[in-house]
Amino acid sequence: MSQVILDLQIASEQAQGLPEEKDFQRWLEGVLPQFQEVSEVTIRIVDEAESRDLNNTYRGKDKPTNVLSFPFEAPPEVELPLLGDLIICRQVVEREAVEQEKTVEEHWAHMVVHGSLHLLGYDHIEDSEAEEMEALETEIMQSMGYADPYLAEKDGLTE
């Protein structure tokens, strides 16, 4: 049986209204077991200031972002289930949910799925990579009972 170990850190001033730990656990379990037997992920919920600082430091972009993924890179001889860390900005997720006409829950789920796929090595820099990753995200989201997360984009509602 596969196992997903979650370390949830709330570093947001406003913890009220956030998804519960069981929600984050369920979303991770919707993604990770199909890729590896045991996975360990840290999810840190932050405010815009920390998101902006990390995004600027690691990506050279001086603005907050929805999710940052930091894969754990162990030496080849070390086998650990630790995949890495997801840093998710509460305010950006909530704002984007409104802009994309999604429920906040759907967008939180999507950010966990999206970030987890980055931890597993998926990317969306090239168009072909983006198509593969978005198709996988859509499949995973739908398997958990959510709509296609890119529906608004496909309908021309967002960029």
Swiss-Prot record:
One of its GO terms (biological process) is rRNA processing. One of its GO terms (molecular function) is metalloendopeptidase activity. The keyword tRNA-binding does not apply. Its EC number is 3.1.-.-. Gene3D superfamilies: Metalloproteases ('zincins'), catalytic domain (3.40.390.30). Coiled coil: none annotated. Its main location: cytoplasm. The keyword rRNA processing applies. It is found in: Cytoplasm. Keywords: Cytoplasm, Endonuclease, Hydrolase, Metal-binding, Nuclease, Ribosome biogenesis, rRNA processing, Zinc. Single strand-specific metallo-endoribonuclease involved in late-stage 70S ribosome quality control and in maturation of the 3' terminus of the 16S rRNA. This is Endoribonuclease YbeY. It comes from Pectobacterium atrosepticum (strain SCRI 1043 / ATCC BAA-672). The lineage of its organism: Bacteria, Pseudomonadati, Pseudomonadota, Gammaproteobacteria, Enterobacterales. The gene is ybeY.
